[in-house]
Design a protein with these regions (language model features):
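Active-site-proximal, well-structured secondary-structure segments within enzyme catalytic domains
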Residues: 2-38, 85-86, 90, 96-274, ...
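Substrate/cofactor-recognition hotspot
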Residues: 35, 41, 60, 69-70, ...
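Propeptide (latency) domains of metzincin metalloproteases
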Residues: 36-37, 48-50, 59, 100
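His/Glu-rich zincin catalytic helix
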Residues: 41, 49-54, 218, 237
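Short, charge-rich amphipathic alpha-helices with coiled-coil/heptad character
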Residues: 50-71, 110
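Alpha-helix N-cap/helix-initiation motif
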Residues: 76, 80, 180, 184, ...
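Active-site recognition of the HExxH zinc-binding catalytic motif
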Residues: 92-99, 195, 274-302, 326
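Zinc-dependent metallopeptidase catalytic helix centered on the HExxH motif
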Residues: 290, 298-328
Length: 328
């Protein structure tokens, strides 16, 4: 697993104090001195967006992009090339057995889109409209990097950094300046209040659940004192945790074989910047948006009235339709 320890803080110039604190804390937890740089998304984004050290940005960018490949950290030990090739072959075999020409047709059969061609047509149309705007914005970043910062040629590891510089120069705003407005406990309080107003529910912490990490919080959803559902909330990035953000079913709402009602349980998982010492985690605006998004999926799963498991909650909903409730 790729990681790097930096002892000279000048090599990390430009990084916000929050990011430096997380890296220092990560090093201390491993009994190391200095700042631990790894490929966890809060660290990666902080370096790519704010760090003045171009060589470090390049090193991190290449390591991140080569994960699980023979050219990545760990070499062939973590190379997934053969696994991916085998997966593609077996998907094609499965599609043929089920009467489809390819796996794309099999996948689309369970979705709203009519065919792979329809999806490609949609993507080409979307790309045709979005690409000119993206190219214009990228051109502005390149001009700004050249004329203001003296960079002749912009590389992939420069994009986020100089986009942030342009945003600061044009609008005098930065995501880091917004973090103090979004302490995690206050964000949860506000999100739960929105849900209370919209759905007439109460959300209460329940410490009786056993969890897999001290960071994990557990809650019950109630209406008029009756428990409707429960969920686990695992917000922060940590070593060996799967990246990204998602909602997963722990248990679906259903009537079991004994005729008893089973209430749903959800897992809401993110990889946000964690707390530093005794202080609460300060979320970025994008992390707040992500949290609301995943909570939307969770509400879809947990507030269902359907008691037949295959069509309860998110089950039986096409994957290209299931994102609608997540826009909560």
């Amino acid at each position: 697993v790729w990681q790097k320890v930096i002892t000279d803080v000048s090599e990390l110039s430009g990084l916000p104090n929050n990011a430096l604190g997380l890296m220092s804390q990560a090093a201390s937890q491993k009994k190391l001195k200095g700042y631990l740089i790894n490929l966890e998304i809060p660290t990666y984004l902080a370096i790519m967006t704010h760090c003045d050290n171009r060589e470090l940005r390049k090193e991190l960018y290449l390591a991140y992009g080569a994960r699980s490949s023979r050219s990545g950290p760990g070499g062939e030990k973590y190379d997934n090339t053969e696994i991916i090739s085998e997966l593609l072959e077996k998907r094609q075999d499965l599609a043929k057995v089920l009467g489809f020409e390819n796996y794309a047709e099999l996948s689309v059969a369970k979705k709203m889109a009519g065919s792979p061609e329809e999806i490609l047509s949609f993507l080409r149309e979307l790309g045709g409209k979005a690409k000119p705007q993206a190219e214009e914005e990228m051109k502005q970043v390149e001009i700004h990097a050249r004329e203001v910062h003296g960079l002749e040629k912009i590389e992939p590891w420069d994009h986020s950094y100089y986009s942030e510089k342009l945003k600061q120069d044009l609008f005098e705003v930065s995501d880091e300046l917004l973090r103090p407005f979004f302490p995690a406990p206050r964000v949860l309080e506000g999100m739960f209040e929105v849900a209370r107003r919209l759905f007439e529910i109460d959300i209460e912490e329940n410490n009786n659940f056993v969890t897999w990490h001290d960071d994990v919080l557990t809650f019950n959803i109630l209406r008029k004192g009756k428990v409707l559902a429960s969920f686990y909330l695992d917000l922060y990035a940590r070593e060996n945790k799967r990246g990204g953000a998602w909602m997963a079913e722990g248990r679906v709402k259903r009537i079991n074989l004994q005729g008893e009602k089973q209430e749903p349980v959800a897992f809401l998982t993110c990889n946000f910047s964690g707390p530093i010492g005794p202080n609460p985690a300060l979320l970025s605006h994008q992390e707040v948006v992500t949290l609301f998004h995943e909570f939307g999926h969770g509400l879809h799963h947990m507030l269902t009235k359907i008691e037949v498991a295959p069509v309860s909650g998110i089950n039986g909903v096409c994957w290209d339709a299931v994102e609608l409730p997540s826009q909560f």
